[in-house]
Amino acid sequence: MKKDFEQKWWHKSVVYQIYPKSFKDTTGTGQGDIKGITQKLDYLKKLGVEVLWLTPMYKSPQNDNGYDISDYYNIDESYGTMEDFEEMLNEAHKRGLKIVMDIVINHSSTENEWFKKSEARDPEFEDFYIWKDPVDGKEPTNWESKFGGNAWQWSEKRGQYYLHLFDVTQADLNWENENVRKKLYEMIRYWLNKGVDGFRFDVINLISKDQRFLNDDGTDTRFVPDGRRYYTDGPRIHEFLKELHKEVFGESDLLTVGEMSSTAIENCIKYSNPDEKELAMTFSFHHLKVDYPNGEKWVKAPFDFVQLKKILSKWQIGMYEGNGWNATFWNNHDQPRALSRFGNDKEYHDESAKMLATVLHGLQGTPYVYQGEEFGMTNPYFDKIEKYRDVESTNIYKILLDRGCSEEEAIEILMQKSRDNSRTPVQWDDSKNAGFTEGTPWISVPENYKEINVKKALEDSNSVFYHYQNLIKLRRNEELLITGRYEDFDIENEKVYAYKRVGENAELIVISNFYGETCEFDVKELNLENASILLSNYIEGPKISNDKIILKPYESIIFKK
């Protein structure tokens, strides 16, 4: 966003994502709970973040870890009570922390009363979901579910198919029905009245479906031929988001962030440009597909570094020019750990964790830190299918075996790509179960918890934790991190990512070595002679001679001049 935009509180903030199920258990059930979040608020305050985004804790059968909501108005007993939630909200506010809730309004659980009534053809709810008759005795279209298989499920009770873009127990809501929208807006207002500070909208750009319900013949090469061209950034999406903004948020100062699946930059500009009155910011995932050769996620592959830089640059420049606003991130509950993916989680654990943090926090947008990222948690490298819990992973494992993969090959792919990689318990200390629970954890604790944990990080002034703390402080003090124009530099370089944040009278220069070997980088055009170092991930500064900087493995520096 250009420098003359009206700054809101979230432009300077850093958001911390909590996946409550794996955060902290206070009851011995083996699953994290709301009291566990309350217990750790002081730790989060120490880190310096201002906003906590909580993934869903609503009543749910937990087929997709809470993204299948059966009751939007109540807290799932496994997390605690509404009183626990209100206490946590109150304690967070006392500490100056804001709470953003995750809400799923593209679909609900098939256990939801709305779905049950719709399936039974209750007149008020009959068209609350997307029901279709068979076509030629089979599914209405060839659209595929994001979790594998066809996206339509037959209901014996109703005698029709319903659409589920995700799990078979997650039925898509019919946004064409005005009463559905009214019910959803009413529900969001209920949580706002409790005092929450904003919402993260799950897969929000999928809510508008092309009402022709056509088969995907693969002719639109912009999209994977699985039907997504007919429901991604659909025909009425901007109309629906404008209505949501008008009916629920108005002129309030709330943070609204949309998760955008397979989106295009033109749409994200529109979604997040304040003049459009839709959302405050957007997540996009193109940079996290650079290890999907030919768009295929479920293969073992290295990441394409130059492509990663080009995608980040495209979004930085495009969103700035279009007055949009990025939510920037490496990690979330659906992605493997970035440290294992883009860094070196063994030989250069701390150096590469700090480097990735520096790169991200130097970009324009609101940075998001995912639990465990701030002290260097890694993928768990689970070597048996029995250790995996995620519905996507267990489904894909069977599909990979059917495709001819050996069990060992399938597990190696899951070790790299599974969503469970980021869902293991937060490693609080070196005691049993990493201090997460006194019971049996719902998913195994990674074996490296004795070396990598919060307690150890807090005791080491040079730890990854304090590097994150310094980056967050820097964001508050350096206006250029908010308003500076992004310019990339030597984008084809195969080892180094270098970019500037340019203001009227000053600029920041971020230079990062993405690999485990020392390398040289030509800085002649960057004129670093009079530049000062604001932050580095090595105690000893870099060597610069003959217009070249010598970068140590995973070295990352922010210069100011």
Where are these regions (language model features)?
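Active-site and adjacent substrate-binding regions of carbohydrate-active enzymes
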Residues: 1-561
